[in-house]
């Protein structure tokens, strides 16, 4: 397979000086939009308790933990500004993405302990399910950094369990484990109620010495009372016993390591929990990426920064998709699938970092004498016609057969 894809056909062409000059305003507008996105990412990162106060408590922020555990330069954040329920923080209370830990790829997610101690907040369930779906689809270990104070009670109706609610996340953990996909968790801080469920459902639980997980409330605590119910007198007795150290606080490390066995191991330092997660990830079976490379990695022949001079910010304006692709793929080479058939759609194979990848993209512009089944109008790029749909179906089927990943550059107004 390697020689077959070592050298492919060239794609793209240099930009003319006139086009670069004409698109200067577009470049400035695109850069302005990117700065707005970067500013929002930074705002979310700084939202909540200042990192300094978290550090004063002897704790790391979720950002600190991620920076410590991932291989340098490997973290690819996802869903950072995803906020489907317009939560006041502008996020879903978790930080997630793809990452390499101890040389092995995984899906990584952690509760943002700078905001309401990592509470379940509106929109978080959908984010969590997207993350677990990703682990399922890509067959990658799921690594949790758990520091969750449970549901944000004033908005608890927004996190009720349903098919896309928080309860489904725990079902997904069981589903992943049944599929042989490990779910690893580092446990920090106090994790009551839903935070406790989050803590007990992974495969391996590694806890910091100050960690606590408990699922409870008056109805649960009453089961510990000889009366069979929980009242003010029982509460006072429990408080007095706790003050005099006559009872081990439920959910503590002493309970879940010594008695229930939920915790696989307990560590003195926060970084030791992360080191232990690294150790488990190092033991994960995985192919070396070079096994799948069809050619040595190579830079595009044309500068990726020129894309802003090709793709207009105005969504109604057209552009040359082939020129965009040429600035993203190795050596600006491709192997087009069925060129000339279904011209409104590009389908082909390319290399990215030496790996083979399928590409589907919508081409723009007028298409004379097309579609072939009518003379009443001419085809317009960005729409989908019969030939293009047939070509996409064939291409996706063959990529699926050969397990070649596909990226779709979707820019279509429909059929």
Name every feature range the model reports, one short phrase each.
Residues 50-53, 139, 195, 403:
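Alpha-helical hydrophobic/aromatic positions enriched in membrane-embedded helices and signal peptides
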Residues 46-49, 135, 168-170, 191, ...:
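Generic hydrophobic alpha-helical membrane-segment signal
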Residues 123-127, 164, 194, 200, ...:
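Charged, alpha-helix-enriched surfaces in structured cytosolic catalytic cores
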């Amino acid at each position: 397979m390697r020689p077959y894809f070592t050298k492919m056909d060239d794609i793209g062409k240099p930009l003319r000086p006139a086009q670069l000059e004409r698109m200067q305003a577009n470049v400035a507008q695109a850069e302005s939009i990117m700065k707005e996105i970067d500013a929002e990412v930074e705002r979310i990162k700084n939202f909540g308790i200042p990192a300094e106060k978290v550090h004063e408590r002897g704790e790391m922020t979720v950002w600190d933990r991620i920076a410590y555990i991932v291989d340098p330069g490997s973290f690819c954040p996802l869903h950072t500004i995803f906020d489907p329920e317009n939560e006041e923080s502008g996020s879903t209370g978790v930080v997630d993405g793809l990452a390499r830990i101890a040389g092995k790829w995984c899906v990584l997610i952690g509760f943002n302990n700078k905001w309401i101690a990592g509470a379940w907040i509106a929109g978080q369930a959908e984010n969590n399910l997207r993350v677990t779906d990703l682990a399922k689809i890509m067959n990658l270990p799921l690594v949790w950094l758990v520091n969750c104070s449970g549901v944000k009670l004033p908005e608890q109706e927004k996190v009720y369990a349903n098919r896309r609610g928080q309860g489904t996340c725990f079902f997904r953990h069981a589903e992943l484990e049944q599929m042989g996909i490990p779910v690893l968790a580092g446990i920090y801080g106090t994790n009551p109620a839903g935070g406790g469920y989050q803590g007990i459902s992974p495969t391996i639980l590694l806890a910091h010495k100050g960690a606590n997980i408990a699922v409870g409330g008056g109805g649960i605590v009453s089961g510990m009372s000889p009366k069979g119910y929980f009242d003010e007198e029982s509460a006072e007795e429990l408080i007095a016993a706790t003050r005099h150290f006559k009872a081990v606080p439920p959910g503590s490390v002493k309970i879940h390591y010594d008695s229930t066995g939920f915790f696989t191991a307990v560590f003195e330092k926060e970084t030791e929990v992360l080191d232990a997660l690294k150790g488990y990830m190092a033991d994960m079976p995985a192919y070396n990426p070079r096994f799948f490379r069809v050619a040595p990695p190579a830079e595009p022949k044309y500068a990726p920064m020129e894309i802003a001079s090709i793709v207009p910010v105005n969504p109604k304006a057209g552009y040359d998709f082939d020129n965009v692709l040429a600035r993203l793929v190795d050596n600006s080479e491709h192997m087009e699938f069925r060129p000339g058939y279904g011209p409104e759609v590009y389908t082909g194979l390319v290399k990215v970092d030496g790996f083979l990848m399928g590409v589907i993209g919508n081409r723009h512009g007028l298409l004379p004498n097309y579609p072939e089944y009518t003379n009443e109008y001419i085809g317009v790029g960005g729409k989908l016609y019969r030939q293009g749909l047939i070509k996409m179906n064939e291409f996706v089927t063959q990529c699926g057969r050969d397990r070649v990943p596909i990226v779709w550059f979707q820019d279509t107004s429909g059929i």
